[in-house]
């Protein structure tokens, strides 16, 4: 079976140049935003790979070309490999290594795995220190959170089992017990690497918090208590003019913190009780989705105190997702309502519905993976492993449907023309054969 193309040195130069150009492109929903608001991106070589949840953009947007847009369980498959255990975390990639988390023995054993990008071989398998497993929803897993890496260490969160850092050879660097999670669905939010800090929040029944840990040692840099009782999202770091903000979208409130000190900057009311999607940014706004029936909020960051009456640009319940995160591209915000298998295209500036269509047969909670944008196309994968490929823009156009033939809850990773897709039992590399 064909192998993944080798990584060539000149690809780094091309990717850095491309990323720089994209940062200067104000018309798109990524890079340097025309409103002076943009996602804090990885340093150095992090732009070249897929080092975190939703990739270097943090928003599920792929900027380079050469990826196939058609596949099946046999077509354009470069390799397949079995993944031990169970988990819904997405792959992350650095250099020639892929990293995943997994759970075995009914959650009593949680691990970080490393695979070879070239052929899918399992390189190493490292367990987190022993601990008590918490309750998780039957669609969740103790290995739901996607790891992150800075090219020196891989950082993974396992809920009640704590935070783990290993080097790229699989040697344990540090482990932190962050307390037991009690939020009735189990862990899910992924850690965020910001400068030399690992930031994560855990909203639960008593003792909710957001914290920053020293990436090198695991020691606490700061910790801020929170009031939310449930929440499963991933924080984002954004640049707003001359300063950075840490955005936490959770139960009832969207809150902004100083990522250096943990001090709250502002809060905006209007979210529902259950919040899973990761916020995205574009056009000077932060877009936050909540709950099984919305709403989605568009907030102008940079305020202070309660900004509900001053910085909430628009609010809608049209097409809001429960699990999948939205994606913004150009002038449009795309959301996938997994409660009814409906994709909605909104005008990002106004919140008005541009189009709304159903993808396949309606199924309650039938889509878990977050959508990605590749080559001006929107890719939406349902739990059955069907990927709907749509043209981006103001008109709905379904190009085709790819069926990988396996249950798929994890979001993909994309590097050097290859899709890396985690199914329920396998890791699959999809490229142009």
Description of each model-found segment:
Residues 8, 21-23, 31:
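Short intrinsically disordered, low-complexity segments
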Residues 1-13:
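N-terminal secretory signal peptides that target proteins for export/translocation
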Residues 13-15, 36:
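Detector for intrinsically disordered, low-structure N-terminal pre-sequences
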